[in-house]
Amino acid sequence: MDRIIGIDLGTTNSCVSILENGNVKVIENAEGTRTTPSIIAYANDGEILVGQSAKRQAVTNPHNTLYAVKRLIGRKFEEDVVQKDIQMVPYKIVKADNGDAWVEVNGQKMAPPQISAEILKKMKKTAEDYLGEAVTEAVITVPAYFNDSQRQATKDAGRIASVDVKRIINEPTAAALAYGMDKAKGDHTVIVYDLGGGTFDVSVIEIAEVDGEHQFEVLATNGDTFLGGEDFDIRLIDYFVHEFKKESGMNLKGDPLAMQRLKEAAEKAKIELSSSTQTEVNLPYITADATGPKHLVVKISRSKLESLVEDLVQRTIAPCEMALKDAGIDRSKINDVILVGGQTRMPLVQKLVTEFFGKEARKDVNPDEAVAMGAAIQGAVLAGDVKDVLLLDVSPLTLGIEAMGGVMTALIKKTPRFLPRNPSVLTADDNQENAVAIHVLQGERKQAGQNKSLGKFDLAEIPPAPRGVPQIEVTFDIDANGILHVGAKDKATGKQQSIVIKANSGLSEEEIQQMVRDAEVNSEEDRKFEELASARNQGDALVHSTRKMIADAGDKVTAEQKTAVEAALVALEAAIKGDDKAAIEAKVEELSKVSAPIAQKMYAEQAENPEAAAKPAEENAKADDVVDAEFEEVKDHK
């Protein structure tokens, strides 16, 4: 089996890792960092930038620089949380034909999985560069509280990126895997408190050693898929906007460029206030009016930041209480608390966690890397490289069907582990029906209409019978990715029908295939751009070395040779400015050809007279010793 990488596809940052020789390796990207900003930018010339390069140009290209897109994945445009984000991001969130929340870039509508695929491609390339071989398979993590639509959309992103997603696993579970394989000895019950860039999860996980095998059992999970570091940033941005308006009378919210600068400043200030008690935000020329340019200068203390976000931190407590209740465990029985996600570096978060669970959280688990490391371990389990790990996860939300009277009948409760084939019997609502509609739901409400509809299908061609007589057995089966398979069988006739519940808010097969083709086209364009850049670099280097050689040769070059070389130089420089790789290569060859006799002549002369050849080098060394001026510090001794 091919090697399976682990990818943490985060809201703010993403990370990729691999298990090598029994150890998990977090792989550095091309920029030399172990995490990559989950930011994608679409340049006017069609180039797609991902990661740090996208982040660097965000201020000058705010409308086409996308961040925190994971918050939109599997979401409907009309949802309150989406409407809230529309007010805060500089890019355009639009309504797709199927009602999904999509993004518009350069006049083109794009689905969140299509955008997330660009990050996955970057992670895939990072792994391939390190391993020196093609990578096609991955384990990708998602928030534990992601619903079926969001999980399916994440798998779609993998397909668009040409990644075979072997497994979708929950982020807290992945973090526990990393912790359990490295830190835990013996039986442990741990809390994984995961406050990331866009989502919050908490899981109660039991780690046991059974006959030499590490067994990870998720007892319960809870969370909020729209609570994370981005919300903390928004509070800071609002504060800066308010302070600036109070000072200047100007509202920055209608200025996308200013808002992008504020976004970066808020993120930076938040990070600084985790290690210092005060910081200053200084943004010159943030805007201008008739009186001239305006500058934003705001001092903010850690206590002020904490007062701005205290309610957000408090919002994490209710899911913690619910997770403990669902697991049937008292907080005093928790052995360790593991913090995951960059936002957990905030002192207020750590203080609250310590107070609630009555113990200090562990500091020896990297909150930015633990999830990707756990995904890599799961990948190694699937590949057969790790044989002593058993992972038992839970369904994050109750799954059921609509019964008579619009009541939801639960088939799989949210607390137990994934239970395959849990049957329930349904009957017909109306007299003499020859078909029964199966309506699949996800949620915790008793009223069917208040839960999320995952899909509908009909069991047709059953004998007409009075209301309540037909006996339809409905079976739910959750696969290892948390994707739901539903079957229905008429007990009288044996007639069967089954479907895989895919995100009804997700992409159609045709859309996914088109996006895969688009990604392949982009990949080909990227390859051509890389080859063109390489040809340009080769041409530039040859121009530089040839001009230096002509200067060093002096009168040893004939006028005829100099004219020919100069003409070839001009032709190559012109070709470098263009986009024709073949033309550049042809001009490189032409310049190499006309300059070769001069190079050979100079080489021969150097071989005959090495002392003369050394003189220019000595002169250059002397020239290097020349300084523009000398300064001496004179101290006043008193």
Curated annotation (Swiss-Prot):
Domain of life: Bacteria
Single GO MF annotation: unfolded protein binding
Gene3D superfamilies: 1.20.1270.10, 3.30.420.40, Actin, Chain A, domain 4, Substrate Binding Domain Of DNAk, Chain A, domain 1
Composition bias type Low complexity, residue spans: 605-615
Keywords: ATP-binding, Chaperone, Nucleotide-binding, Phosphoprotein, Stress response
Induction or repression: By stress conditions e.g. heat shock.
Region (Disordered): 605-624
Entries under SUPFAM superfamilies matching the protein: Actin-like ATPase domain, Heat shock protein 70kD (HSP70), C-terminal subdomain, Heat shock protein 70kD (HSP70), peptide-binding domain
CDD domains according to UniProt: ASKHA_NBD_HSP70_DnaK-like (cd10234)
Family: Belongs to the heat shock protein 70 family.
Function (record text): Acts as a chaperone.
Listed name of the protein: Chaperone protein DnaK
Lineage of source species: Bacteria, Pseudomonadati, Pseudomonadota, Gammaproteobacteria, Pseudomonadales
